[in-house]
Amino acid sequence: MNSKRLHDILARFQRQRILVVGDVMLDQFLWGRVSRISPEAPVPVVEITRESFFPGGAANVGRNLRALGSSVSVLGVLGDDGPGEELRELLEQQGVDTDGLIVDPNRPTTLKTRIVANGQQMVRFDREKCVALPPQIERKALDYFELRLKDVSAVVFEDYAKGLLSQKLLNTMQRLALKARKVTAADPNPRRLLLYSGLTAVTPNRSEAFAAAGLPYVEPVDEVLRDETLLRVGQTLLRTWRPRNLLITLGELGMCLFRPGKKPHHIPTVAQEVFDVSGAGDTVIATLVLALAAGADPVEAAEISNHAAGVVVGKVGTATCSPDELVASFARNRR
């Protein structure tokens, strides 16, 4: 992709409004250092020096979309608690529309606490309640979806198996979005495989793709287009989900784009250094759907999302990528 084409696509990012539907959560990082072992048990003592919070899950997809320049609305469920207030405030500070964040007093806001010491993540604590939505909350979610749908150019479904998306609710939302001819994308969860149908794009990672295809995981080979098991998985998911585009992310091997009736297309990674892969999948789907909504063809959109992923894995924590960083990444890799 030449520089002019990239700039044309990026210039259209700010004209898009994207609706993100899924499980929102708050990421908490406790940063510190280890200087001794506890006398109570053979474990390190971490002296906490600072604390930071970031939107996580579907909220991180919204954060990524805002960093790329688009308008964003997020539809999700919070608890009536401090983490929920913190998450809402963080999103509002970043310009994300939070009118679709529905409070359910019978569940806590999902909170993931990571302890990072001496530059290494040591442990993660999850505080959450993974149950289906009560009927009245599900009705509110669908009402908001129908209200917002007419104003957006694309819809992203983000399932983290926390309970927002039931198969019934997803089916209704998919049908409405497809009828309205919106760009649609989904990031599946291997612990609770929902049935997607006819979306513009689906973006599993390698292990998620194998799980969805019902095949035992097989370690990758270096030549992606000679990875017969991966190619079989891709074709299986094209038949199962019937997406127009299936983008399987492959970590250090990049990505592989599958489309009905076309040969698989491998996109090598452009990451220079990898410090933290948390949230990279959120960046991929955010960039992919935004590029497609902005008029990029599937290969162009996949290449742009590959560069965005290369940027964020070089940062610590759930990070984002800006249009300027995308331009710089493409420039580096043209040399």
Regions found by a protein language model. Name each.
Residues 2-7, 39, 43-111, 329:
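Substrate-binding N-lobe of the ribokinase-like
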Residues 1-35, 330:
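Positively charged, low-complexity intrinsically disordered leader regions
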Residues 19-21, 124, 153-156, 185, ...:
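Structural motif
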Residues 148-164:
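Short acidic, glycine-rich surface-loop motifs adjacent to enzyme active sites
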Residues 101-107, 114-149:
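Conserved phosphate-binding/catalytic loop of the ribokinase/pfkB sugar-kinase fold
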Residues 236, 240, 244-245, 270-333:
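Conserved post-catalytic alpha-helical subdomain immediately downstream of the catalytic base
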Residues 13, 149-150, 193-197:
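A short, aliphatic-rich alpha-helical micro-motif
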Residues 163-264:
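Conserved phosphate/ATP/ADP-binding segment of small-molecule kinases
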